[in-house]
Amino acid sequence: MSLSRSEEMHRLTENVYKTIMEQFNPSLRNFIAMGKNYEKALAGVTYAAKGYFDALVKMGELASESQGSKELGDVLFQMAEVHRQIQNQLEEMLKSFHNELLTQLEQKVELDSRYLSAALKKYQTEQRSKGDALDKCQAELKKLRKKSQGSKNPQKYSDKELQYIDAIGNKQGELESYVSDGYKTALTEERRRFCFLVEKQCAVAKNSAAYHSKGKELLAQKLPLWQQACADPNKIPDRAVQLMQQMGNSNGSILPSGLSASKSNLVISDPIPGAKPLPVPPELAPFVGRLSAQENAPVMNGVSGPDSEDYNPWADRKATQPKSTSPPQSQSKLSDSYSNTLPVRKSVAPKNSYATTENKTLPRSSSMAAGLERNGRMRVKAIFSHAAGDNSTLLSFKEGDLITLLVPEARDGWHYGESEKTKMRGWFPFSYTRVLDNDGGDRLHMSLQQGKSSSTGNLLDKEDLALPPPDYGTSSRAFPTQTAGAFKQRPYSVAVPAFSQGLDDYGARAVSSADVEVARF
């Protein structure tokens, strides 16, 4: 290698060191600063994501409390849990990004500046030393040759000249070898730094791949089930349908707050105390087998609430005779559809209180009237035992006893009849019995009323017709604070409709078509 090439390689070696110190390290510091900004932004995303999924959990809690959207609440919980796991994987990636990349690069770049400065200085010093030794040998050889040319005996300096030539060759070889090694070392130092950066970035990429793989695995497994859960917004879950059917199949129900029933301001199922056993009232005869044709639409034992103002108040009703009786065939159809038909009401403006309708009632049920017409007297079978205790106005019976009804309609969930076994007469809770068909089979009588039961109206208005005493000591003020769960120890309260327990949950209110469109998602 010629001297000029050695000098050129020396300049290249110095340029490599200077490139690392003047370009690579500043660029690496800028990379670290940008990485810290990126880490800070991802940490902000993580913090925001926690708040976002906490809110999603709250939405899931709301949905889980609804009878119609409970499974969607479970879906929202699953979504929050899946994304929490994905977020945990993201946090692992952030830890790797901070610990394996930013921290180590920051430590390396601070140490590297001093190391490279020392390495470059050492190389330059050694290269200069070897170059000076070579220059000195060359200068000595030049002097020797001048002396040899002016001497009368040139052979005298020939041996010494050969020694200098050998020394110069050795010095030049050492210098060239050192410069070559120095250049190789400089390139190696540069490559090691870039490899370190790539290696740490690969570690971050590996954690990033695990993060995305985890997210893909979880979402691919759960997403089809989530999409299936919300595929049909109009589908009511079977559980909610069964709940509605159970409520619809119960004759009694829970009294809405604000309702009271009789003239004495007692709860509907609270009988009037101090009465004696009732004989069959003489006023009953005109009602047996004769019902007004205006009761054509099947209406359950009564309505109260915001829609009940279409009906006459109980206190204002007079003893009137029905005009005509519905055809037997029509009455039979109404009786068959009794359990599947909701009350038909007019659409009226809702009110904020039930107080204005506490003394109002509906016409008598068409299906039960039809039963009276066909059979003369309707018979029921006890499905629960009932003890009257010391109260002489109540009728005691045991499960399986048969009772003949002596009035056409139940009043406020209480019916009046005669036990075929004991021949005793008195009031009893109608929900404790099943109505017997013509063939002797029993069927469960149902009531979808939303307020007070329909009654015999003016017949029961008379002061000489006594009602049973209070229903097991419950007061009208106790009902508003009770829930449906409090009545599971016996059949639903005969005072209030069972269907009203879940009616508000399903938004069974009169709304305009425009409101429906706005509410639809």
Curated annotation (Swiss-Prot):
Query: Which CDD domains does this UniProt record tie to the protein?
Result: I-BAR_IMD_IRSp53 (cd07646), SH3_Irsp53 (cd11915)
Q: Does the keyword Cytoplasm apply?
A: yes
InterPro entries associated with the record? AH/BAR_dom_sf (IPR027267), BAIP2_I-BAR_dom (IPR030128), BAIP2_SH3 (IPR035594), I-BAR_dom (IPR013606), IRSp53/IRTKS/Pinkbar (IPR027681), SH3-like_dom_sf (IPR036028), SH3_domain (IPR001452)
Q: Which Pfam families match?
A: IMD, SH3_2
Keyword ATP-binding in the entry? The reply is: no
A GO biological-process term: actin crosslink formation
* Compartment list: Cytoplasm; Membrane; Cell projection, Filopodium; Cell projection, Ruffle
| Stretches with biased composition (Low complexity) | 321-333
GO MF:
cytoskeletal anchor activity; proline-rich region binding
> What name does the UniProt record give this protein?
BAR/IMD domain-containing adapter protein 2
What is the species listed in this Swiss-Prot or TrEMBL entry? Answer: Bos taurus (Bovine)
From the broadest rank down, the organism's phylogenetic lineage runs: Eukaryota, Metazoa, Chordata, Craniata, Vertebrata
